[in-house]
Amino acid sequence: MIQKFVQQIKNTVQESLDGVHTCIPGEIVSFDAAKCTAIVKPTGKFKRPDGQKVAYPQIAQVPVHFQQSSSQESCICFPVKPGDGCLLLFSEQALDAWRSGGEDFPDLKHDLTNAIAIMGVCRQPNELMQEAQDKDAIIIRQKDSRAMLSNDEVLLKRNDDQFMQMKGGEITLQNGGTVLKLT
């Protein structure tokens, strides 16, 4: 009798916890740059009360996070494409009222509809992470173009033939075969 009661309590607690979402990897389906929101497909599956595993539904109007100051005067923006990885965080409060400046916060704690996408979570590490770590630098890359900032060097590079480097009191400019060094 007591074992049945304990099992029922465990089942009830588990059912309640199954409805609480904290974070899960996701994949961008589409991105609206003007609104900075996306449709995101969470990865993985959830278990229904009958035991069946089902894929999570797509989530619409997910705010996408970029590094920026609260004044939005300083920010790092980059293209968001279908298939890009992200981490979905599920807010304790409804985001619609917060985004519109309202104060009506319905009780939807950790609901799938209150997701925020943090970009940059990928299945495989980016090879630039090791270079940034080794050089104690910030590296920004867009295909063949890159900018690197470290304590002793600034490098802007479009490709192997076009770059500008500031290092050790010297500025080097290269465009094709033409190299200009300033000291």
Please place each PLM-identified region on the residue numbering:
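Intrinsic low-complexity, repeat-rich intrinsically disordered segments enriched
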Residues: D152-T183
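Hydrophobic packing positions characteristic
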Residues: M1-F163
